[in-house]
Amino acid sequence: MQEFIHVKGAREHNLKNIDIKIPRDKLVVLTGLSGSGKSSLAFDTIYAEGQRRYVESLSSYARQFLGQMDKPDVDYIDGLSPAISIDQKTTSQNPRSTVGTVTEIYDYLRLLWANIGTPHCPKCGKEIHQQTIDQIIDRLMALEEKTRVQILTPVIRGKKGEHVKVFEDARKQGYVRVRVDGEVRDLAEEIKLKKTQKHNIEIVVDRVVIRPDARGRITDSVETATALSGGLVIADVIGGEPLSFSQNYACEDCGISIEELTPRMFSFNNPYGACPVCTGLGMQKRVDPERIIPNPKLSIRQGAIRASGWGNADPGTIAAMYYNALGKKHGFTLDTPIEGLSDAAMHELLYGTEEPLELSVSRVSGGVMRQPFEGIVTNLERRYKETSSDYARSEIEECMSEIPCPACHGRRLRPEVLAVTIGGLNIAEFSEKSVVKAMEFLQTLRLTEMQHKIGDRVIKEIKDRLGFLQSVGLEYLTLSRASGTLSGGESQRIRLATQIGSSLMGVLYILDEPSIGLHQRDNDKLLATLKRLRDLGNTLIVVEHDEDTMFAADHIVDIGPGAGRNGGEVVFAGTVDELLKSEKSITGQYLSGRRCIPVPDVRRKGNGKKLVVKGCAVNNLKHTDFTIPLGTFTCVTGVSGSGKSSFVNEILYKKLAAELNGAKTRAGAHDQMTGLSYLDKVIDIDQSPIGRTPRSNPATYTGVFNDIRDLFAKTADAKARGYGPSRFSFNVKGGRCEACAGDGLLKIEMHFLPDVYVPCDVCKGKRYNKETLEVRYKGKNIYEVLDMTVDEACEFFSNVPKIARRLETMREVGLGYVKLGQSSTTLSGGEAQRAKLATELSKRSTGKTIYILDEPTTGLHVADVHRLVDVLQKLVDAGNTVVVIEHNLDVIKTADYILDLGPEGGDGGGRLVVAGTPEEVAACENSYTGQYLKPVLERKNHVKSEE
């Protein structure tokens, strides 16, 4: 077998015809600036070719379903193994996907509960047993000799009616006695029952005395009884306790029976197991009063009610007629703040009236109409069910929130399935345990000898998979956690754990920043896992910026030296010791300490105002209080799963968005938030795409394209032709090429194969028609301007201050290499985030904005982090507040204030361990963040405290 993967002539995207040898069966890290070409080499070249070769080996019939894979732009690759890509872009948004289903642990749980679970009656909770005819007879024969027994078969259980036909059928079949509501009656008599009462009726099949020679007779009687009732038998022991038997899983008391247990009954994705009300989703969308009335301090006239069809209270509207009639009944006006309405008035406003209201009809002649009011919530829910309009549904969905299903209480399964237990827990209760707690439960589980024989192999598989999740630092996750709520790093590590479980060897694994979202404390577990995969005989290529991972690597490849057009070359390839001595590698300069992100000389104290959040209780937060000094750069830190996102994203951002931006968001559980009056808006700068269509690009997103179009419209040529700014837009008719509608590409549908995009043969991919492209500014047409990088455009428009200012902010945040017209869909998460930052920086600051960022260093090289920190500090220098969730110590050390959550993840977290400056956190012995921060701060000059 070859010792290297040899890549020759790689030219994908910005790669500059590179040749590289990557050692096999080693842990190899690819690093370099954002946009330098790391992913182009790892995913778009090496992985794409490995995958393509595998697909090529399949039959043409199979290939039509998998799709045709393009050959990467590379001369050849030698020594390639079957490739598995574990990236962050494949997090499932399917609401039916959970941690348990993704890891396949839930499949083993279904097998376990179906085979060794103990069923109970879902109504009374009594244990249900399934017995054969032989077991029933053995039990009866074990009674004391000469015991008299009536063998009964239940035919009616708790049903109203006279049941005349039941008695007639029993007479025809030759039976002489029945027991009605506990009293034995003769069928020769006329039996009259009250129609309105519930009754229990059992046919007396036989009366026997227990003797050794009676076994044959008892067998016949029991078989007859089970045939009549569908498997149920009651042995009424004279002078003793009655015995109930069932051939099926059925409760003799309640008459509820369940089918024989099978694994599919425990699946919430199967109609046999899924809760019939929520179809296994565990949640239901319902109209939420808090989203209809987000601000109860406003009156109806001021727009307190923000629901489709009910927001306009102008005279003459139907809404105003109902509001006035309700006001007349309850003594309020349209100018009364909603919080001033009585409980009765509020209830009728939302859920309607039983009695008719007197509605004043605004006609010329006037008049009064009497009609009940449906209520805003009831009206919206009815319209949501009845409408066929997608627009109307989306309008109403704005007023809806997801609530746990009232039938299964969020547990997704049918009641009879939830009544099956092992060790006192049903399958949903087990799934709600964290990985650690689930492992503890299985280790202390006591089973019978028979259960051990059946379940031991399954339990071993479950334990192994739980162990793999622990080994990648995910011990705080619950198996019931929806996949869509996981971060990119978490979902990637779950798939990594699944791969370890497969124990394959000779595979090429390509990973994209597996350390994202991991605290330094948990990073060691991840590195041990990667080494374990390597030691099995696999090759790992990891795209990574994390220092610890680089120091643990067998081989490092640094792609650069810059980004975009300035990248795409191999700057360095070798061991980490060699990298530290490299003069050319920026990575080596930062790793060796020759370059660094400086600790600020002064920590800001803030503007004296504070944002205080009390009693936070979302997920694992333990009614925790937080204080954020305004006018500071605040970092929220803590181990993975400690509650950072619960506080910042679920409570802080949603509350601020509702109060300051008027968003219809519902904040997570907390007691109160004070200090809102010191802020005027909140902006969440995440890594979501800045546009989801190829028409969106950095120029349109940042707004600089409007200024560029205005400039072109002011040229003499454009004025002579009568062209306005819209002429230079590729989104409207006029200036764009109509053959491709301004896309520059034509989509050709290939049915079984993926759609193919080819350049438009009319405009040759330039998006505009010939006449528009004839208009030039400083010798360049609009297409050529869009084809410039931000750096090139900065020089080109240097004498146009309005445009130059916007472009300069894009350059400041590190987007100098990005083309103005580059499709937003091709930007990485980090690039999209920096485009948002550039847009914010170019706006005039009010000094009262709070910016929220969740792990902004994702995908960023340390040199890019340096630039990002400078940008965030600029936002704070303008008087704003920046709150960042972060694990990167280079960012944490530059903060003014730190909120450190923990001390552990999951149940062991949710508390504030320490709050203060980085120096104060580093001095806290209980803080894991402090322990790792301390040596970082000690390497720098001591910080002067602000006077």
Residue ranges of model-derived segments:
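Conserved phosphate-binding elements of NTP-dependent enzyme cores
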Residues: M1-E947
